[in-house]
């Protein structure tokens, strides 16, 4: 299994995701893929046995925020591996961008109309996704992954405590700068649950350490828009910004590119996700750090929880996926840990 995980991740980093073959028609979306393969006798991990396989070829739909990013590619890979291990069909799809809320709602409704056996959603906007999922409550397992939503009767949430994880980065920067330091935050979608939780964790830990947060702006979760946002911040606060705390690694990369284009190399930039692209920049001295989630495990565990629920097993209402701060001190060890999966 470890070798397979490594190969899957390497493929994600090398090429953009392509739709996999399916034993049934794929959902009507250009950003959809499905996996349906025989159950594997190999355990999901060394510490956790594979749950009992489904008695038939169940179909689990996973609607992510998008498939057009490195991070969500890792989540999809985890879902695909779970499909292999449990011998089920898993449809993975998502809108063209995380800002496409109405497109995601339509995808959720489409999957429910196909009479799937369970559905897992990473909501672009929590209330919109919850509204689309409400008719499924009590009929099939309904789970959230990465980003939670308020929905009475939902089965479970699988993901990182975003506020607590972001606080790791905020405290690190506060300790580095010392009291009186100045920072800015580049958040994701304004008002979106994950973005607000991470922003809260950043700001509270920075302010507790005596750091002034000069401003917070949205980078829309992408490198190019975050680059433009950082350009604006640099123009408004010349020679003041000492650190930037970002919603995700794409945001951090955009901020770093803006700094580089302006000949600035002394601003500490923190990302969030633990993507290899960001860790490589940490080792190159261009990023200060990233808060590593475990997106592959997150996708795997979400499908695993859905299978358990279909099988009638009791699952926890919250299934946590731990995060850790990656800096230059442990970046190589983090990459070595990934590489060791192939052994």
Task: Go through each PLM region and give its residues.
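A residue-level marker of the well-folded mature domains of exported/periplasmic proteins
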Residues: 13, 22-343
């Amino acid at each position: 299994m470890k070798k397979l995980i490594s190969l899957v991740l390497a493929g994600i980093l090398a090429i953009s995701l392509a739709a996999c073959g399916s034993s049934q028609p794929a959902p009507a979306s250009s950003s959809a893929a499905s996996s349906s393969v025989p159950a594997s006798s190999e355990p999901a991990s060394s510490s956790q046995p594979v749950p009992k396989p489904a008695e038939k070829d169940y179909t689990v739909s996973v609607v992510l925020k998008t498939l057009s990013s490195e991070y969500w590619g890792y989540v999809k890979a985890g879902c695909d591996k779970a499909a292999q291990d449990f011998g089920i069909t898993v449809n993975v799809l998502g809108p063209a961008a995380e800002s496409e809320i109405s497109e995601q709602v339509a995808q959720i409704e489409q999957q429910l109309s196909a009479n799937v056996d369970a559905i897992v959603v990473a909501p672009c906007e929590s209330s919109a996704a919850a509204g689309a999922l409400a008719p499924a409550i009590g009929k099939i397992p309904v789970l959230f992954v990465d980003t939670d939503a308020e929905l009475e009767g939902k089965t479970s949430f699988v993901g990182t405590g975003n506020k607590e994880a972001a606080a790791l980065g905020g405290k690190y920067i506060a300790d580095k700068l010392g009291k009186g330091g100045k920072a800015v935050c580049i958040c994701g979608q304004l008002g979106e649950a994950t973005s607000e939780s991470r922003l809260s964790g950043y700001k509270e830990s920075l302010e507790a350490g005596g750091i002034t947060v000069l401003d917070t702006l949205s980078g829309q979760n992408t490198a190019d828009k975050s680059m433009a946002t950082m350009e604006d911040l640099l123009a408004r606060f010349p020679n003041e910004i000492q650190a930037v705390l970002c919603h995700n690694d794409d945001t951090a990369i955009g901020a770093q590119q803006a700094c580089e284009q302006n000949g600035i190399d002394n601003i500490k930039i923190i990302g969030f996700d633990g993507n290899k692209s960001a860790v490589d920049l940490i080792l190159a001295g261009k990023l200060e750090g990233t808060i590593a989630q475990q997106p592959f495990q997150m996708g795997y565990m979400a499908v695993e929880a859905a299978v358990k629920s279909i099988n009638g097993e009791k699952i926890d209402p919250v299934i946590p996926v731990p995060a850790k701060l990656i800096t230059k001190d442990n970046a190589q060890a983090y990459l070595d840990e990934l590489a060791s999966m192939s052994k």
